[in-house]
Amino acid sequence: MVDNIWSDFAWSYDAICSQLNCYRRMADKILRDTQGLAHVIDAGCGTGLVSQALVRRGARVTGFDNNPGMLAVALRKQAESPEPERARWTVLEGDVRVFPERVEGGADAVVLNNVLFYVREPEAVLRESLAHLKPGGRLISAGPRRRPDLQKVMEQSIEEWKAEGRWDEQLQKATAYHVDLTRRLVTDPNEMVTFFEPEALVAELRRLGFTRVLAADHDDYYGENYYVCMER
């Protein structure tokens, strides 16, 4: 496993991301594009935010991550879930460049949510995703188009929270901690290494063997993030 800045993120990730409207809008797209799909691989699942939402909706989910702090949160969620959900949810240690052996192929979808920006060899991850999808299976990838404008994202998020009456002491405390870590993440050239415009990612996926574009935009995180969904 890799113990890095994401171990520090583990405490605040759920507290903040689950409250960010920009994250919720992106997660809603993932739920939209996996509607009715039976088996979803959540590669680089982090704390299991997306995995848990998929499992609750009835999907069978295999999630994996290589950071001990994030993985511990996902494992705790899985263990505390009601038995029917727990039975459909597998959480593993693993690297997105070479999926764990226990990850079954023939999946209906592979989700790469805020994953590729941390990988120097994105082609390896995309090939692994392709190899684990059934014909017609979907790859969903979301992430930054460039080094993110943290100030813009947080200022607009805080304005939304205030307008909704959610900007309370607990959220302010979690935000302060999260922003400090995120600032380290976005300014360290070794932490964020790969960025995509949606059109560029679509072209790369076509080159690797994906065929049909179901979604491709750059609306998320107030224009900072791309979202792409393509069929094998």
Spans of model-derived segments:
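Core SAM-dependent methyltransferase catalytic element
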Residues: L208-G209, D217-R232
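Short conserved loop adjoining the S-adenosyl-L-methionine
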Residues: V98-E104
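Conserved class I S-adenosyl-L-methionine
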Residues: M1-Q35, L49, A53, E80, I140-Q170, ...
